Amino acid sequence: MSSFSFESSARLPLNPRFKQILHATVKSYIDTAEPVGSKMLTQQYNFGLSSATIRNAMAVLESWGLLFQPHTSAGRIPSDSGYRVYVDELISPPTELIQQMRAALAENLGERQDLESLLQGATRLLATLSGCVALITAPQSVFVSVRHLQIVHIGEGRALVIVVTDALQTRSFLLDLPQPEMAEQLETLNNFLNLQLQNRRLDDLNAAAVEAMGGEFHWYTDFLRGLIALLQRVLQPPTGQLYVSGVGEILKQPEFAEPERIQAIVQLLEVERERLGPLISPTQRHSRQIVVRIGAENPLGPMQFCSLVSSTYYLNEVPVGSVGVLGPTRLPYDRAIASVQAASDHLCQVMQAEDEPHRW
């Protein structure tokens, strides 16, 4: 189970007073969605400072680009840079919240299930826990290994192939047997294939690997080559497979009251969701860190008013898929980070769990 950490930007040298006031301003805006003034902070927080002192400090934070006024007469709200400092420097790892969410995931997703049901359930629960749009990518088949394979003769030169992977996938398909006498050798062939294929990644099973298997079944090389090709095809998830849940959550936020923003974000989440996959793809990861992209740090236009919190889940220490939540930049970051960390940990734990293949 991975420890909590997240990528951070270069730190801005803020003294304790500025940190305290920036933290309070961001937290108040996250909670209320209303611009924050010095009077509000004086009433809500026991700073031991006058309203004028707080107002001056907020003006300095604005001059540094961390706060801004949406209207001349309004209070201040955080900029993307202000949120960045808040995430990188002003909040602590939400350890207790992570533990609570891990428990919720284990309780609600505790039963052993197939991969698709697991990911669908995890996505729905992640949306509920975070209050955001939840995104989970399916494991990439190139990282998947065969755990068990069984070929069953069903008559008339046909066989049923059942395969179980270490990513909780179970698939079956029909296959022609090239020679009638092969049906009598299936038990021996099954033992041979399980010995040769077990725990080998599918992308390692190329033509050379099939040739190298050799053994007593060397005259079935063409059959083995066809079998491997079918395995790679049936275990390959659809391109850009991404599970999404909680779209309605983001539409409840005042940031998306404008019809243009609603249309853009719904178009992205419901019609063009394949564009989201690469943003949280495990190929973007170099460590087990939480990644937080805020506002303009996101490359897609509809996400310029959003924050994306994401991480990776692993299978046999290899990153195979990703978990993320998407919401407005006015995001409860501690809760978003905790939910993503907990979901990533849970998927890692389930993927690594040892069990009898036939129970899947």
Curated annotation (Swiss-Prot):
Keywords: Repressor, Stress response, Transcription, Transcription regulation. SUPFAM superfamilies: GAF domain-like, Winged helix' DNA-binding domain. The gene is hrcA. It comes from Gloeobacter violaceus (strain ATCC 29082 / PCC 7421). Pfam families: HrcA. One of its GO terms (molecular function) is DNA binding. GO terms for biological process: negative regulation of DNA-templated transcription. Negative regulator of class I heat shock genes (grpE-dnaK-dnaJ and groELS operons). Prevents heat-shock induction of these operons. InterPro entries: GAF-like_dom_sf (IPR029016), HrcA (IPR002571), HrcA_C (IPR021153), WH-like_DNA-bd_sf (IPR036388), WH_DNA-bd_sf (IPR036390), WHTH_transcript_rep_HrcA_IDD (IPR023120). This is Heat-inducible transcription repressor HrcA. Belongs to the HrcA family.
